[in-house]
Amino acid sequence: MNTTKPSPATAAELLRASPLDALDARILLAHALGWSRTQLITRADEPLDAAARARYLALQARRAAGEPIAQLTGAREFFGLEFDITPDVLIPRPETELLVETALDAIDGIASPCVLDLGTGSGAIAVSIASERPDARVWALERSVAALDVARRNARKLLDPARAGGPLRFLESDWYAALDPGLRFHVVVSNPPYIARHDPHLAEGDLRFEPRGALTDENDGLAAIRTIVAGAHAFVAPGGALWLEHGYDQAAAVRTLLDAAGFADVESRADLASIERASGGRLPG
């Protein structure tokens, strides 16, 4: 008598048999099948062909080995937009939406504001600001050519074509290096690498698969922030603002750097987990 258990043949059976977190399994199965999440419910008992099952099982194995969902699906939602993601860019996190909200607050009421995003990566911050403020002139700087390619692709996909090639400008640059010295911005924002070189988190979870240069400054976690703060006076307009994302335990240190650099109204803002996640200040003038 054949007692071999049959392989899962439907979406419902694959999900029940999956060793993954239920949400991860649903996301990957929908991606493998090209279905919406609603279709996973309405077509749950529909037989799947061998190729479809194989696609899902390959993704399941990679996720079980730790690969990030965003890299497996090639996408991540951020600020209501779906960004293309590759292993060349940092995966946008929900807490970084605070930086976008803060930048939008800083330019509220300013006509055609100038915005600078340093270390744009996937373009999540710059594209989100440009989407919310079509009148804004946004510069997005990034030293990684591969990351810039992803950012440009996201701009083309998510913004009006006129914006993707015009008021949103991408430059290959190591922080401020490629900027015209005469430029001034109403707000400068950055989510720089702020994890210290020896932080054990770099060897854990999704971070193992993301570009190391977007995560750590290969120093104490504040080196990139020091560079950005030190150069800000040359590019922040009088009365303009500088805002930086940082680690959960770095707010006080970043405020000290901003105070020492002569910024006024220095403060930190907490994310939805009540963690001080962004700090900034205003340049007097």
Swiss-Prot record:
Residues noted as binding S-adenosyl-L-methionine in the record, renumbered to the chain: G119, T120, G121, S122, G123, E142, W175, N191
CDD domains in the record: AdoMet_MTases
Reactions mediated catalytically: L-glutaminyl-[peptide chain release factor] + S-adenosyl-L-methionine = N(5)-methyl-L-glutaminyl-[peptide chain release factor] + S-adenosyl-L-homocysteine + H(+)
Binding site for substrate: N191, P192, P193, Y194
Protein name: Release factor glutamine methyltransferase
Keyword flag Coiled coil: no
GO molecular function, one term: nucleic acid binding
Role noted for this protein: Methylates the class 1 translation termination release factors RF1/PrfA and RF2/PrfB on the glutamine residue of the universally conserved GGQ motif.
Keyword S-adenosyl-L-methionine: yes
Family: Belongs to the protein N5-glutamine methyltransferase family. PrmC subfamily.
